[in-house]
Design a protein with these regions (language model features):
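Short alpha-helical transmembrane segments in multi-pass integral membrane proteins
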Residues: 1-23, 81-148, 190-246, 302-367, ...
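N-terminal transmembrane alpha-helices
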Residues: 10-47, 61-76, 80, 105-112, ...
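Transmembrane helical elements of multi-pass membrane transporters/channels
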Residues: 21-40, 142, 153, 176, ...
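Helix-terminus/linker motif at the lipid-water interface of multi-pass membrane proteins
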Residues: 35-54, 123-130, 186-193, 253-286, ...
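Small-residue hotspots at the loop-to-helix junctions and early N-terminal turns
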Residues: 48-61, 136, 140, 199, ...
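Small-residue-rich hydrophobic transmembrane alpha-helices
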Residues: 53-113, 150-169, 263, 276-340, ...
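Hydrophobic transmembrane alpha-helices of multi-pass small-molecule transporters
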Residues: 65-68, 180-184, 210-214, 286-289, ...
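Short runs within selected transmembrane alpha-helices of multi-pass transporters and secretion channels
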Residues: 74, 143-161, 169-180, 198-213, ...
Length: 458
């Protein structure tokens, strides 16, 4: 295809409405993914016993680490497709789509190999308890069989989101997620597969979601359509995908590593505090992922409009997405402060554990909205094609800073508030640096476009 459909263009129309309409399905997709993951844990805990539950739980860090890398890689695909689509360069869009498919598949196969071969060493690295180790190794190996499929789903999601269609990925994720729940119950209760059953259900669901989204791309009547006869690795395009995607993926991976040090700080308290923290931490994923929908929308809208040379819409896209994400974080965080005990109740029946969880909520509830300034600005810089600078800043500000905080301020005071305050402090510090970098990058981008327009008139 060499056409460009106007219906999904982000370069025209009311921005506030468009960003909201694109972001809502993304937010629902993110929340559904969390709920489906929670269902895995619930089924194992309810029907397979505490050892199986512990085995699955002990793999969470590595699952987050590697899936985060794939998500970061897909962000690079999203930005590049949006850039070329906005610039109305159909051939470049097609090259990006077909090269990105191969890059994503290669990344998924690489992670599959790491999971199959390296699971024992990785789990021992975290001092996984010996009684949990066999189940954890089995879970990771079966779960990682689905990594190529997960990589392909993220690829398709990135392409559709880049052109403003976020409803299809939501539909396919809903179908796969419902299947995942049914298979969880079947494999664990009927087949008595325990840990392997939950992992197998996830793998099958990932294959289904990947198949659905790839099939949808083959039916598209536009330049971003997937044609298996055109699959070819275009080297210059591949380099651009990797330049945009690898820093984002590396950033997500480093976040997971930094959080290990924070968890070590939590583990230095008694078991009640550890349980309370685990219960309260469920709010993090729900609120972060809801806010994250506006970050992906921000990158897509900015990239399309930058490609189209519409600088006024580039700047407006950033401020509108920032306002939405900040507002959502403030509302959800405020609601958590008011209804925190009710939120924690489904996770524990012990009032002392709820009291411990509230200590985290009382710090984090008002702080979630601060993260919008950091994350939305990072997305904005990536929308302009800048990835290395924002990644270096966030690694220093939100990863290195957090580790240093744990070993200095927290080590000195050794209180729960002194540990949890590292989140808003690191977000504020990183946000200030990211905003300064974005202003610099935006001015450079404006100058580059103005020079390009001047040369075009000659």
């Amino acid at each position: 295809m060499s056409t460009l459909a106007k219906s999904k263009s982000m370069t025209e129309g009311p921005l506030a409405k468009q960003i909201l309409l694109v972001s809502l399905p993304l937010a629902l997709s993110n929340l559904l993914q969390i709920l489906f993951n929670l269902s895995d844990v619930a089924v194992v805990g309810r029907f397979a016993g505490s050892t199986a539950l512990g085995a699955v739980g002990s793999t969470a860090t590595f699952v987050t680490l590697f899936t985060g890398f794939l998500i970061g890689l897909s962000n690079g695909i999203n930005v590049l497709v949006a850039r070329f689509y906005g610039a109305r360069h159909p051939k470049d869009v097609s090259k990006t789509v077909h090269s990105a498919l191969l890059v994503s598949l290669a990344a998924g196969v690489l992670l599959l190999f790491i999971g199959l071969v390296g699971s024992p060493a990785l789990l021992r690295l975290l001092n996984t308890k010996e009684d949990l180790l066999p189940g954890a190794i089995l879970y990771l190996r079966v779960y990682f069989l689905g990594m190529p499929a997960l990589a392909l789903y993220n690829f398709g999601n990135a392409v559709f989101s880049a052109i403003g269609d976020t409803k299809k990925p939501l539909t396919y994720l809903s179908i796969a997620g419902a299947l995942n729940i049914v298979l969880n119950l079947f494999f664990v209760i009927v087949c008595k597969l325990d840990v392997a059953g939950v992992a197998l259900a996830s793998t099958i669901a990932q294959c289904v979601s990947a198949g659905l989204i790839l099939h949808a791309l083959t039916k598209v009547r536009d330049c971003y359509a997937l044609d298996f006869h055109k699959i070819k690795l275009d080297i210059p395009t591949t380099k651009r995908i990797l330049l945009l995607g690898i820093p984002a993926g590396f950033q997500n991976a480093v976040f997971a590593i930094a959080n290990l040090f924070i968890q070590a700080g939590v583990n230095s308290f008694d078991s009640l505090m550890v349980k309370g923290n685990s219960a309260a931490a469920n709010a993090d994923a729900l609120i972060y992922d809801a806010m994250a929908a506006f970050y992906m929308a921000c990158a897509s809208f900015m990239s399309q409009n930058y490609g189209a040379g519409k600088l006024d819409r580039v700047k407006k896209s950033y401020f509108i997405a920032l306002a939405y994400s900040f507002g959502l974080g403030a509302v959800l965080g405020g609601g958590l402060l008011v209804f925190g005990r009710q939120f924690l109740a489904p996770f524990t029946t012990e009032s002392v554990v709820i009291d411990a969880g509230m200590k985290r909520i009382l710090v984090m509830g008002w702080a979630y909205c601060i993260s919008a300034f950091m994350d939305c600005t990072i997305a904005a810089s990536r929308g302009l094609g800048r990835t290395i600078g924002p990644t270096v800043i966030v690694i220093l500000g939100s990863c290195v800073f957090r580790v240093a905080w744990v070993y200095t301020i927290f080590a000195h005071f050794h209180t729960i508030p002194s540990l949890y305050l590292l989140y808003p402090c690191s977000w504020a510090l990183t946000a200030a640096a990211e905003i300064a970098y974005f202003v610099f990058a935006y001015r450079q981008s404006v100058q580059r476009l103005q020079q390009h327009d001047a040369l075009a008139r000659l």
